[in-house]
Amino acid sequence: MPKTINNYNRFLPVVHFSQTELEESLCNAVIHNDKKAAEIAIFKLNISDNFTSDLRTNKSYIDDTHNIFIGDSLPLVAVKNNNLDMLKMLLSCGFEPNTPAAANCYTPLWYVTYKGYTNSVRKLLEYPINNINETFGKETPLKSALIHKHTEIAKLLIDKINPDKFLFNGVENIALLAHDQFMFIINEISTDKKISLFKLCSKNITEHQDFILFGKGEAEINNMHINNTYMLDYLDNNHDDSTTIIGSID
């Protein structure tokens, strides 16, 4: 069975590092973009009842073409290689789509968002991702998309994220109002989802305003004022009698 190491970081599951010859073969095949060899290794692991969907690399591969660290999940290795076919194969075989890496907490979704790999983002979002908006010590995938101006990816994420989970980290995500593209993208989602999202933004502005504004430059604060005014006007014109409108940036 795979070697198991307990990791006390609350974000990470128990990590299964590759140990057997078959597991090593699978990891090496994914690292070196050998899809056929990876399929054979997975088939043999399934036959031997020794397959785990949380298999990790047990060594680092750092050279001109690889940036793989010990403890990377195999879907993360695939997206680091920008190998969409390998990613599709791993996900179809049951690998978890968004497990954070042991070394640096990178998730496949965060990585492809950061890199701007739109097709890989779209493929990952076809699978249930419970931690879609967690930060794991970094900016959220959505904030990363906005920072790096990956507009199409930001649209995909906003469309996928349940509004109730959108502000999983309220202080982190409400700062999105400082980005000039945020409202442009928000305008393309449905009215009901927009209202839910704006209500959450409004609540978090009220609760965290001092922290939100701390360290922001004049242009960012100006964007926040403009976007927040638009948001409150939209809510004022579209809310029902049960909606409480709160949240202004002073």
Curated annotation (Swiss-Prot):
ANK repeats (start-end): 70-99, 104-134, 137-166
Presence of the UniProt keyword Repeat in the record: yes
One Pfam entry name: Ank_2
InterPro entries: Ankyrin_rpt, Ankyrin_rpt-contain_sf
Key words, A-Z: ANK repeat, Repeat
PANTHER family: ANKYRIN REPEAT AND PROTEIN KINASE DOMAIN-CONTAINING PROTEIN (PTHR24198), ANKYRIN REPEAT-CONTAINING PROTEIN-RELATED (PTHR24198:SF165)
Name under which the protein is recorded: Putative ankyrin repeat protein RBE_0623
Organism the protein comes from: Rickettsia bellii (strain RML369-C)
Species classification: Bacteria, Pseudomonadati, Pseudomonadota, Alphaproteobacteria, Rickettsiales
